[in-house]
Amino acid sequence: MRDLLSKKSHRQLELLELLFEHKRWFHRSELAELLNCTERAVKDDLSHVKSAFPDLIFHSSTNGIRIINTDDSDIEMVYHHFFKHSTHFSILEFIFFNEGCQAESICKEFYISSSSLYRIISQINKVIKRQFQFEVSLTPVQIIGNERDIRYFFAQYFSEKYYFLEWPFENFSSEPLSQLLELVYKETSFPMNLSTHRMLKLLLVTNLYRIKFGHFMEVDKDSFNDQSLDFLMQAEGIEGVAQSFESEYNISLDEEVVCQLFVSYFQKMFFIDESLFMKCVKKDSYVEKSYHLLSDFIDQISVKYQIEMENKDNLIWHLHNTAHLYRQELFTEFILFDQKGNTIRNFQNIFPKFVSDIKKELSHYLETLEVCSSSMMVNHLSYTFITHTKHLVINLLQNQPKLKVLVMSNFDQYHAKFVAETLSYYCSNNFELEVWTELELSKESLEDSPYDIIISNFIIPPIENKRLIYSNNINTVSLIYLLNAMMFIRLDE
């Protein structure tokens, strides 16, 4: 979807991503090679992004350029900026909110000619069709195609473009939706939390706009759970919620509307409760197959990485649901900001073999069930496994062999012991810290020693397979940071 940005904006976004991700010096020539453009273009882009993002501090020197005050929150601001300043995305959003308007009104809104509008819509459709099954029509002005894809695309778009606390939907206030969701939480065992609540509100309000313009999803009766719909329609308090919908939205909360709002969660392959899922494992051959595939996969991972799976059935339930909500919950696929993919990559940087095995087996699971097994879906399912497995990170870290650390000082033995004790307290328990006790010291003796890391306040020549930390005054704060960082570099090598 990044091709909906102009070439210049696309390049500037990639430029900022490079500077954010690597947090190091880049020469313009290197950036030009990475971005496949001229050094002049890089120079112009740097000038533009410095002006567009005054809160970011760019540091230039003979070493090149870098951003020196970045943190993980700043990058989100970058994506919001490119969404906001993209004509293509802005026109898409305008049409979503104003279906049925005249094409001339779009031209007036964006100060473009009729021919320019048709050219832009043609470009939008060309890019969208590479990934989604829908298109924009100007005769009349509407968005048509696969309704599931349309609803997912725009819900994901709103989640990426707007900040977490923003609510950009003028036609639908959030209160009646919150009332409806709270009723669902009360009447079912659906897990309620802040992020899930916001995700559902975004999905439901997107569905409401589509319903308002007369677009409904086709419901396969064979895969639809009528009992869930009937249960909700008979829930205590539904009348009050229906009145709020009628008065604030001018929409009747009848069975058809409720079905359209929750169609993803009323499908038979989605289980709102773990106990219902476990009962169905014994009755439905497809669910049984899904369960046993995941069970075998989890057992293999548990044995290979010596992880005790405390919540195996609960984890299988979550994985099964996730696999059957393709393009029906946020972050399955991204528009510009691959936030979930970045999360997986960060975890993979620490545990590369583990994540590689997870992805391989989950891809096999999806393919066997003949559901979507795209790389983004595999990432999405891998995220569910990693975050929903109890104490996963703790278990993986505890199973790592401890790093042996030698501390030496040219002051005296007491100084070395003081540093070792301090580091032992502040660093993780994945280190064994010792001081040098022999009377003599040589490079050869250090080469033959069992230590992985050597800390000293005097210079030691480079030693193969040893990580050396030289600190003239042994700055404890810096050492704590360096030592913990080295632990993560070592993991799963």
Swiss-Prot record:
Record's signal peptide: none
InterPro entries xrefs: BglG_antiterminators (IPR050661), HTH_Mga_DNA-bd_dom (IPR013199), Mga_HTH (IPR007737), Mga_PRD_dom (IPR013236), WH-like_DNA-bd_sf (IPR036388)
Annotated Gene3D superfamilies: Winged helix-like DNA-binding domain superfamily/Winged helix DNA-binding domain
Domain of life (superkingdom): Bacteria
Keywords on record: Transcription, Transcription regulation
Stretches of the chain forming a coiled coil according to its record: none
Disulfide cross-links: none
Pfam family, one: PRD_Mga
Family: Belongs to the AtxA/AcpA family.
Protein's name in the database: Putative trans-acting regulator SP_1800
